Regions:
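Conserved AdoMet/S-adenosylmethionine-binding subsite of the radical SAM
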Residues: 2-125
Length: 125
């Protein structure tokens, strides 16, 4: 796996040092670069049209709707959890439509669960 911005030895040392101090390491990525082997929780949120190389992890989170996403291929990837999150467009009408589309998607695709951003529902930045 690649380490962003440096050698794998540096990433190994950093991960080992954080673990030695009792930290749990979690990342969220678009998946275009492989996650370091020592990461404890890997969440991948792919963007349509990108080449996803990290196809294993704890959580695959797809922002919905997202045209061009190959759902069937994604379902074959090695993730523990498959999540759909309604896209936040900044427009309340569009957001309502996106929420309905996400709910409809998970109701028709039992492998996927709904994920929401609670801070946005509460009006927090």
């Amino acid at each position: 796996p690649k380490a962003v911005g440096g050698s794998g030895r540096f990433a190994d040392a950093l991960v080992d040092a954080l673990h030695a101090q009792g930290f749990t390491i979690a990342i969220e990525s678009n998946g275009t670069i492989a996650a370091h082997r020592g990461i404890d929780w890997v969440c991948i949120s792919p963007k349509a049209g990108s080449e996803v190389v990290q196809r294993r992890g704890n959580e695959l989170k797809l922002v919905w709707p997202q045209q061009g996403s190959d759902i069937a291929a994604m379902e074959g990837w090695g993730f523990d959890n498959f999540l759909i999150q309604p896209m936040d467009s900044g427009d309340s009408g569009v957001n309502e439509s996106n929420r309905k589309a996400a709910i409809e998607f998970v109701s028709q695709n039992p492998k996927w669960r709904l994920s929401i951003q609670n801070h946005k529902l509460l009006g927090l930045p």
